[in-house]
Amino acid sequence: ACNFQSCWATCQAQHSIYFRRAFCDRSQCKCVFVRG
């Protein structure tokens, strides 16, 4: 299962200033970010 809060934190850590948001697609964590 995808944990929304840990997904959000993981995406934020990976993409830092380019991070926009995160969401769960079924059991997968998806990151939304801007490509610099």
UniProtKB/Swiss-Prot annotation:
Induction: By bacterial infection. Expressed in salivary glands and hemocytes. The keyword Secreted applies. The modification Glycine amide is found at G36. Its main location: secreted. GO terms for biological process: defense response to bacterium; defense response to fungus; killing of cells of another organism. InterPro entries: Scorpion_toxin-like_sf, Termicin. Disulfide bonds join C2-C24, C7-C29, C11-C31. Keywords: Amidation, Antibiotic, Antimicrobial, Disulfide bond, Fungicide, Secreted. GO terms for cellular component: extracellular region. The keyword Lipid metabolism does not apply. It is found in: Secreted. Weak activity against Gram-positive bacteria B.megaterium, S.pyogenes and M.luteus, strong activity against yeasts C.albicans, C.neoformans and S.cerevisiae and filamentous fungi F.oxysporum, F.culmorum, N.crassa and N.hematococca. Less active against filamentous fungus T.viride. Inactive against Gram-positive bacteria A.viridans and S.aureus, filamentous fungi A.fumigatus and B.bassiana and yeast C.glabrata. This is Termicin. It comes from Pseudacanthotermes spiniger.
